[in-house]
Amino acid sequence: MAISKEEVLEYIGSLSVLELSELVKMFEEKFGVSATPTVVAGAAVAGGAVAESEEKTDFNVILADSGAEKIKVIKVVREITGLGLKEAKDATEKTPHVLKEGVNKEEAETIKKKLEEVGAKVEIK
């Protein structure tokens, strides 16, 4: 009588951790394989280099400091983000604060220019 795959799985499931570890070692010796995962270090490094060489297309506009003219900054933040008065005020008080995410470079520069004109400090990342 042949043993079914389900019976093998049942048996393996009933083994203790120590017995299972010994079974793995036996498989490694008998079949000349290793249970440790192989890591391809070169692929990870190459992927990082490719990402750095590509020009970034999505930028985040971050309000680093609202400066002395807070009311003017709040008005510009409302204009840019469409936030209500309270939300815009909170955004200018809790700096650094991400105002816009995933915008193109041109739009990010325009937003930065508007905010800097009213005395805010802005970062683009």
Swiss-Prot record:
Coiled coil: none
Keywords per UniProt: Ribonucleoprotein, Ribosomal protein
Pfam families: Ribosomal_L12 (PF00542), Ribosomal_L12_N (PF16320)
A cellular-component GO term for this protein: cytosolic large ribosomal subunit
Record-level Gene Ontology MF annotations: mRNA binding; structural constituent of ribosome
InterPro entries in UniProt: Ribosomal_bL12 (IPR000206), Ribosomal_bL12_C (IPR013823), Ribosomal_bL12_C/ClpS-like (IPR014719), Ribosomal_bL12_oligo (IPR008932), Ribosomal_bL12_oligo_N_sf (IPR036235)
Signal peptide per UniProt: none
BP GO terms, sorted: translation
Record HAMAP family: Ribosomal_bL12
Family the entry assigns: Belongs to the bacterial ribosomal protein bL12 family.
Role description: Forms part of the ribosomal stalk which helps the ribosome interact with GTP-bound translation factors. Is thus essential for accurate translation.
Assembly, per entry: Homodimer. Part of the ribosomal stalk of the 50S ribosomal subunit. Forms a multimeric L10(L12)X complex, where L10 forms an elongated spine to which 2 to 4 L12 dimers bind in a sequential fashion. Binds GTP-bound translation factors.
Protein's name in the database: Large ribosomal subunit protein bL12
Native species: Helicobacter acinonychis (strain Sheeba)
